[in-house]
């Protein structure tokens, strides 16, 4: 046993001696031109340093300062988080290395300060909390040259890093760290103001990161408008005037109007962007998890918007999981990508939670939860590329649209599914949409997709009376917004509940309470709607407008109830083809006491069977229907149980 131990010790000593023989202690900056393993024990200063391809450099007390390092497949070994590349750039690439941001001179000293008596109009807080620290712009630009082209690198930020606003960046406040053509990069554990742009990269993991803005979260005021910036407005009683003398009191279309752009709101640009540089390149294998994004224009972007999508490569194979988002100017998650999974993400205070845009297909959003939204999620494609938007779905998610995010002169929508591949169905399953408004708005399923299908969903609409006595309203609409090649788009609501709640009390000759339009056709010519359950409570007026321009409506095995609706009596302003089966209608209809308004068309077809109606319904149709086009079977008054045949 003792001899064996001596043998092992001798072998280990031999290996160490051989390794020592291979490792060269660097004497000067020009002594590393051959391939080898180099130990740097002192500071090396030079404008250019050539290191043999495939070499390894080990820092052991020294560092490199002010040099452009030329090396391919360079392995870097650092013992700790000290600065070893001081103002250096790499021409080449590194491999199989484990590095920290501080190895490149980045200072992890970002901190939060307070400024009292912040007088910006409309802000709910009087004290501004803003971030400051050492400007790491130059150091980050250097480290980006090391990560670009790298393979098998573990990169740890290990701290909070400030980056100053760059005047040349205009509205996009901080600079980006641009990393190109890297493979197998793991980036983790840090807080940044700067955004990161990955171009033509593969197998990228970003985890346990925080991407923040120049200010801590605050509810920035109205920042979008569809009007002209030349006129003054009021939002919640606060006056906003035309910007003069460099003041920033106005929102000009999408971008904040002021001398420093979005800096005045404390917003930073996108957190992370994954993109391509040409049609021949790709960005694949993306994994973003356990990250937080706040006070950004956007959070995670998979592929940037283009004027010509034929000039881009593919962004594909992305997972965004267990991430949180707060206070975004546009979308927490936006994409022009394929084969994407978004899972267990949450956020608040944003224009729109998720944008599944042009070129996006095979996208699954599951377990998303967002509140304080102005819009719901969106699938939308440029018409010329509609055939590349397909097989997208949202599951087990919830979205609350409550207009805390002010947009002047614009309506909201619950879901925008504009354009998609003909024959494809955009599916929303096991999800809840909540809509709150005390002003006006449209809870819209806005579609030009060939088919949109809601399964086991809940659509909740809550209307509040305004303090000035005027009437808020909601239009529950399914309509075509853009020209489409699909000839008969269809919206299906399967086992889906609709709840509309208001504070109803009507007075003679005047309607001063919330009212709702249901399924109104706004520009739509052909539609199919299949409804499960709809409950309307406390509204002074209801117009259920399934217009004749809609091709087909099917209501089956449903519970339809309307309460406190004293103005309008039609349940259904019928489409060309109406089928009602196994359905119960409850609630007082009011003025007209009629279930269906017969359309003024020649080739309509209506069928009502195995259905019960409220006692207030005296007849099914406003005019005697043409029996050649109408079938009534087993329709009864739910109170008297008597049949209704006309």
Language-model regions: role of each:
Residues 41, 60, 72, 102, ...:
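Feature marks extracellular polysaccharide-active and adherence modules
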Residues 34, 44-56, 64-81, 112-119, ...:
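Extracellular beta-strand-rich solenoid/capping regions of secreted or surface-exposed proteins
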Residues 29-31, 35-37, 43, 48, ...:
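Detector for repetitive beta-architecture
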Residues 87-96, 630-646:
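Extracellular/surface-exposed low-complexity segments
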Residues 3-8:
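Sec-dependent signal peptide recognition
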């Amino acid at each position: 046993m003792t001899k064996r131990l001596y043998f092992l010790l001798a072998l280990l000593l031999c290996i160490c001696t051989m390794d020592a023989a291979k490792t060269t202690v660097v004497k000067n900056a020009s002594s590393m031109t051959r391939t080898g393993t180099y130990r740097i024990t002192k500071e090396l200063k030079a404008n250019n340093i050539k290191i043999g391809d495939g070499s390894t450099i080990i820092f052991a007390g020294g560092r490199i300062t002010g040099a452009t390092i030329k090396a391919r497949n360079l392995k870097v070994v650092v013992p700790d988080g000290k600065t070893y590349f001081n103002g250096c750039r790499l021409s080449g690439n590194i491999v199989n290395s484990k590095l920290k941001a501080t190895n490149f001179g980045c200072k992890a000293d970002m901190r939060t300060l307070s400024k009292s008596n912040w007088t910006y109009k409309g802000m709910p807080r009087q004290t501004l909390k803003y971030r400051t620290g050492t400007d790491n712009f130059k150091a980050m630009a250097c480290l980006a040259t090391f990560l670009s082209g790298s393979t098998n690198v573990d990169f740890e930020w290990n701290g909070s890093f400030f980056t100053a606003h760059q005047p040349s960046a205009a509205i996009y406040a901080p600079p980006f760290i641009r990393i190109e053509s890297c493979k197998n990069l793991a980036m983790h554990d840090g807080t940044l103001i700067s955004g990161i742009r990955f171009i033509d990269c593969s197998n990228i993991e970003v985890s346990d990161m925080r991407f923040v803005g120049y200010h801590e979260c605050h509810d920035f005021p109205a920042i979008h408008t569809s009007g002209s910036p030349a006129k003054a407005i009021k939002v919640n009683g606060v006056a906003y005037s035309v910007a003069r003398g460099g003041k920033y009191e106005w929102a000009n279309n999408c971008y904040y109007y002021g001398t420093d752009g979005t800096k005045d709101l404390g917003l930073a640009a996108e957190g992370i962007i994954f993109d391509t540089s040409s049609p021949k390149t790709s960005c694949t294998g993306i994994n973003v998890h356990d990250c937080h994004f706040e006070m950004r224009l956007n959070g995670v972007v998979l592929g940037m918007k283009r004027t010509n999508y034929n000039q881009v490569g593919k962004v594909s194979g992305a997972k965004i999981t267990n991430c949180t988002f707060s206070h975004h100017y546009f979308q927490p998650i936006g994409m022009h990508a394929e084969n994407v999974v978004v899972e267990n993400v949450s956020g608040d205070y944003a224009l729109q939670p998720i944008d599944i845009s042009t070129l996006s297909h095979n996208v699954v959003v599951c377990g998303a939860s967002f509140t304080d939204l102005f819009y719901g999620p969106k699938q939308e494609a440029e018409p010329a590329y509609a055939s590349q938007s397909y097989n997208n779905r949202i599951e087990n998610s919830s979205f609350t649209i409550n207009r805390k995010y002010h947009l002047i002169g614009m309506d909201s929508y619950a879901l925008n599914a504009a354009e998609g591949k003909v024959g494809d169905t955009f599916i929303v399953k096991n999800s809840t949409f909540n809509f709150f408004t005390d002003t006006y708005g449209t809870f819209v399923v806005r579609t030009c997709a060939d088919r949109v299908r809601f399964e086991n969903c809940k659509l909740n609409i809550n209307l509040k009376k305004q303090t000035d006595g005027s009437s808020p309203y909601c239009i529950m609409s399914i309509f075509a917004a853009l020209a489409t090649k699909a000839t008969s788009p269809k919206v299906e609501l399967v086992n889906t509940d609709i709840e509309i709640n208001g504070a109803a009390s009507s007075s003679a000759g005047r309607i001063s309470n919330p009212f709702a339009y249901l399924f109104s056709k706004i520009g739509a010519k052909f539609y199919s709607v299949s409804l499960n359950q709809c409950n309307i409570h406390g509204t002074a007026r209801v117009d259920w407008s399934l217009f004749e321009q809609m091709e087909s409506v099917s209501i089956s095995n449903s519970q339809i109830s309307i309460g406190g609706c004293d103005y309008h009596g039609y349940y259904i302003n019928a489409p060309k083809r109406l089928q009602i089966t196994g359905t119960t209608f409850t609630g007082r209809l009011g003025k007209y006491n009629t279930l269906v308004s017969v359309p003024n068309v020649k080739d309509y077809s209506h069928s009502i069977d195995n259905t019960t109606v409220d006692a207030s319904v005296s007849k099914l149709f406003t005019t005697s229907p043409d029996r050649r086009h109408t079938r009534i079977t087993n329709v009864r008054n739910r109170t008297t149980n008597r049949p209704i045949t006309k």
